């Protein structure tokens, strides 16, 4: 169902269990030409790798309050957090928007560009109702692959980059440090 109530059958192109993202497709020939021309706008993907992203005003649309059609307005408060997943790491954009633990949707900058996909469960334990999002820059490649119906390569490793501090204090060599290997991974 589109925002104006128009309904159409959709098919699942691909889904990513790690991020909870899915790409669904609607056959264009099933939609009215006027509807396509006047009511559909393609979202522009921006960048979440902005140097001074903290303090950036944002609008959260979709389900940031846990109900369809809700929205919130605030700023990015931090982009220092990361979420390690199998074979990748996602940047987490934290906001000061009070939302729901069942939040979902999209985070836009004031130019109307998508800069994040809202996720739940990535907030600090003492800030569970603050809206957080995966940075869009890290997701662009995944979205493109899912849109093309491509599967993800999967090795089953969770790792981090070795920092200068870890190298000097712990003697860990520079490079990738494997924190975890998923059971039954290749």
Feature-to-residue mapping (PLM):
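Conserved active-site neighborhood of the chymotrypsin/trypsin-like protease fold
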Residues: 1-62, 66-67, 101, 153
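Residue-level recognition of short loop/turn positions
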Residues: 4, 110-111, 186
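C-terminal cap/linker of serine protease catalytic domains
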Residues: 10, 110, 114-173
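Conserved positions in beta-strands of structured domains
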Residues: 11-14, 77, 158-160, 179
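Short, conserved beta-turn/loop elements at beta-strand boundaries and strand-helix junctions
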Residues: 15-20, 77-86, 162-167
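Extracytoplasmic/secreted envelope proteins and their assembly/folding machinery
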Residues: 21, 52, 58, 73, ...
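Active-site region of chymotrypsin-like
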Residues: 27-43, 70-132, 171-182
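Flexible, gly/ser-rich surface segments that form the specificity/activation loops bordering the active-site cleft
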Residues: 48-88, 123-126, 145-146, 150
């Amino acid at each position: 169902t589109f925002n104006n109530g128009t309904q159409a059958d959709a098919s699942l192109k691909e889904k990513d269990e790690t991020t909870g993202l899915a790409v669904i497709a609607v056959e264009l020939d099933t939609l009215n030409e006027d509807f396509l021309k006047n009511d559909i706008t393609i979202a522009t993907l921006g960048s979440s790798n902005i140097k001074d992203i903290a303090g950036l005003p944002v609008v959260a649309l979709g389900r940031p309050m846990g109900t369809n059609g809700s929205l919130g307005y605030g700023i990015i408060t931090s982009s220092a957090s990361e979420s390690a997943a199998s074979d990748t790491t996602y940047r987490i954009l934290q906001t000061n928007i009070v939302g729901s633990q069942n939040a979902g949707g999209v985070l836009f900058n004031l130019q109307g560009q998508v800069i994040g996909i809202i996720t739940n469960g990535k907030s600090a334990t003492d800030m569970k109702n603050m809206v957080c999002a995966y940075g869009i820059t890290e997701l662009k490649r995944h979205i493109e692959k899912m849109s093309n119906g491509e599967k993800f390569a999967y090795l089953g490793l969770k790792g981090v980059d070795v920092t200068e501090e870890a190298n000097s204090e712990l003697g860990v060599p520079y490079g990738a440090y494997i924190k975890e290997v998923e059971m039954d991974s290749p």
